[in-house]
């Protein structure tokens, strides 16, 4: 990545900026919240509620742990009072009026801005088919209320069960938000395969002429961007502490270790610090992988927003998904 040109490796189709940033959201935020603060730190013998988090702290161990997880979620403190479009536009800096909850004329980036997966949730919710943002944020608020109501005493078994129930709501919906992103970017990769092919004419991957070459390189750049986002989000699904088993294996094989390039190559591993590549791959076959991936997100994760849907309009979907020329990557 360090040797690439501004984070872009044109030979292998890697956009490291997108790949690393999207995976970091999952590998840090989602992982820390769902495999740490909302998991073992909610156990009776971990970060007790009848003791300060640390010497001099005015909050308990449980309060700190729950609040830390909420911070990783990334929602504005007043986000639950806004519509999905308002929350989405706040992050896009298109609606600073609604971001300024206390009306002091400035936006507090700590409490009045949406970040990370909360932003993506709002983006999916504004389509009207889901309510991820409010479901997760309300579960955070309700779980925190249980901890607050304990008034610095140990949580009872019933209180702890309630807290863990809200934690499950948070993490199951958070997983679906990430799965929605996988669905979305699988659709983007699918579309950009067609865009790349459209710049190749009858010369396969050999593009001549300055204008044609520029168009081809621009299409490849966007293709790499979307694959990087897809790979980052799909890898994130592995980080909650829940073993995805065969579903995860299938997802990883469909995404691949890199996108299939116009010359039929695709990264398939590393040796002595350098990428190894397979040859003879098909971009058309990889496009079918993206359809299979969208179908997997529907069947196994129950995504409902389905932004950038490429499978609903295919009348012979079962036939396409069973295509023999799109065998999954080994």
Functional labels for PLM-detected ranges:
Residues 1-330:
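Mature extracytoplasmic or organellar-lumen-exposed domains after removal of signal/transit peptides
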């Amino acid at each position: 990545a360090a040797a690439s040109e501004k984070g872009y490796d044109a030979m292998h189709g890697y956009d490291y900026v997108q790949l690393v940033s999207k995976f970091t959201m999952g590998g840090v935020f989602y992982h820390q919240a769902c495999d740490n603060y909302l998991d073992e730190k909610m156990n009776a013998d971990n970060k007790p509620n009848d003791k300060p988090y640390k010497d001099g702290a005015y909050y308990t161990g449980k309060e700190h742990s729950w609040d830390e997880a909420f911070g990783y979620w990334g929602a504005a403190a007043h986000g639950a009072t806004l519509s999905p479009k308002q929350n989405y536009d706040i992050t896009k800096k298109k609606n600073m009026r609604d971001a300024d909850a206390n009306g002091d004329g400035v936006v507090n980036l700590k409490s009045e801005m949406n970040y990370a997966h909360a932003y993506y949730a709002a983006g999916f919710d504004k389509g009207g088919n889901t309510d991820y943002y409010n479901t997760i944020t309300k579960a955070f608020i309700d779980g925190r209320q249980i901890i607050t109501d304990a008034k610095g005493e140990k949580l009872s078994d019933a209180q702890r069960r309630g807290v863990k129930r809200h934690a499950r709501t948070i993490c199951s919906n958070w997983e679906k938000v990430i799965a929605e992103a996988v669905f979305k970017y699988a659709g983007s990769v699918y579309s950009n395969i067609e865009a790349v092919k459209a710049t190749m004419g009858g010369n396969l991957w050999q593009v001549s002429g300055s204008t044609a070459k520029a168009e081809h390189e621009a299409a490849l750049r966007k293709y790499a961007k979307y694959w990087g986002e897809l790979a980052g989000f799909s890898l994130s699904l592995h980080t909650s502490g829940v073993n995805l088993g065969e579903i995860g294996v299938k997802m990883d094989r469909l995404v691949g270790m890199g996108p299939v390039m116009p010359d039929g190559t695709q990264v398939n591993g590393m040796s002595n610090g350098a990428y190894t590549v397979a040859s003879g791959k098909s971009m058309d076959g990889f496009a079918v992988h993206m359809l299979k991936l969208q179908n997997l997100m529907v069947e196994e994760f129950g995504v409902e927003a389905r932004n950038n849907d490429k499978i609903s309009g295919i009348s012979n979907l079962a036939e396409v998904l069973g295509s023999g020329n799109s065998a999954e990557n080994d």
